[in-house]
Curated annotation (Swiss-Prot):
Record-stated family: Belongs to the mitochondrial carrier (TC 2.A.29) family. SLC25A38 subfamily.
Protein topology in the membrane: Multi-pass membrane protein
Regions crossing the membrane: 14-39, 62-88, 121-146, 174-197, 225-251, 280-298
Name this protein carries in UniProt: Mitochondrial glycine transporter
Gene Ontology terms: biological process: glycine import into mitochondrion
GO CC list: mitochondrial inner membrane
InterPro entries noted in UniProt: Hem25/SLC25A38, Mit_carrier, Mitochondrial_sb/sol_carrier, Mt_carrier_dom_sf
Subcellular location: Mitochondrion inner membrane
Length: 307
């Protein structure tokens, strides 16, 4: 396999992931900001936080670190995920040669290789855990920038404050809870997403199903299938992993009070109530579902164009 043959394939996942992540991050930043503020205060409500917003532009506070984290993280994650899934497909002789597209087992709505449910679960979880660690410093800065507990006026001030007060460890605060949230979420998401792409065309009305001359779905049909699959899969995976998101946010906002995942979990259950573990779920559910629909819809179509 030549370098020229490898480059377009790998770069297509990098480009598709970057622009898909960037678009979803900027468009949905208000939901992320509101979710963070609801989670930081046990008495907070959506309406209370909305009343504290002085202008619509404040809903996009923290967009820069959020956009950096999501675009770079999405590009790295989807590139890493593709390498892992392609390697597994090659081992199973589904892809004897990565330069020969006719050997790849595809869904008709996608140009991604088809794997078993267990392989989708494991590759999704491992890739997300790895990339989550790499992008953790941006995540910590993003969460604190969105919060009302810290009044940072610039990214430089945020970085300096965290390093001065907590050292390098401060940039990885809450990684355990983040990994416990993101790795299972990503594994479940990839499993459900790939399965949905197979099942959804069977239940969609025939007027939505159109084929191109090559036998695959048209852009309209594949976008409908992929986006709907992404929204449904993200909704279920988000609900299951919601408690880890609350724990992670509390640890990053109040590191002196919440020192580890178990301590944070027991404190919330004992001093508040179990339902508080799902605090901000409505905001996260809306954001994650829409984000997955936007990001994966763009990603799948860009990959097809560049491959």
């Amino acid at each position: 396999m030549t370098e020229q043959a490898t480059k377009p394939r790998n770069s297509s996942h990098l480009i598709g992931g970057f622009f898909g992540g960037l678009t979803s991050a900027v468009a949905l930043q208000p939901l992320d900001l509101l979710k963070t503020r609801i989670q930081q205060d046990k008495k907070a409500t959506l309406w209370k936080n909305l009343k504290e917003i002085d202008s619509p532009l404040q809903l996009w506070r923290g967009t820069l670190p959020s956009a950096l984290r999501t675009s770079i993280g999405s590009a790295l994650y989807l590139s890493c995920l593709n390498l892992m899934r392609s390697s597994l497909a090659k081992r199973r002789n589904a892809v004897p040669s990565l330069t020969n597209d006719s050997n790849i087992v595809y869904n008709k709505s996608s140009s991604l290789p088809r794997l078993t449910m267990y392989e989708n679960l494991l590759t999704g979880a491992f890739a997300r855990g790895l990339v989550g660690y790499i992008t953790m410093p941006i995540t910590v800065i993003k969460v604190r920038y969105e919060s009302t507990l810290y009044n940072y006026s610039s990214l430089k001030e945020a970085i300096t404050h965290i390093y001065t007060k907590e050292g390098l460890f401060g940039f990885f605060r809450g990684f355990g809870a983040t990994c416990l949230r993101d790795a299972p979420y990503a594994g479940l998401y990839v499993l459900l997403y790939e399965k949905s792409k197979q099942l959804l065309p069977m239940v969609l009305p025939s007027r939505f199903i159109h084929y191109n001359p090559e036998g695959g779905f048209t852009t309209y049909t594949s976008t409908t299938v992929n986006t709907t699959s992404a929204v449904l899969s993200a909704s279920l995976a988000t609900t299951v992993t919601a408690p880890f998101d609350t724990i992670k946010t509390r640890m990053q906002l109040e590191p002196s009070k919440f020192t580890n995942s178990f301590n944070t979990f027991t404190s919330i259950v004992k001093n508040e109530n179990v339902l508080k573990l799902f605090s901000g779920l409505s905001m996260r559910l809306a954001r994650k579902a829409l984000s997955a629909g936007i990001a994966w819809g763009i990603y799948e179509e860009l990959v097809k164009r560049f491959m």
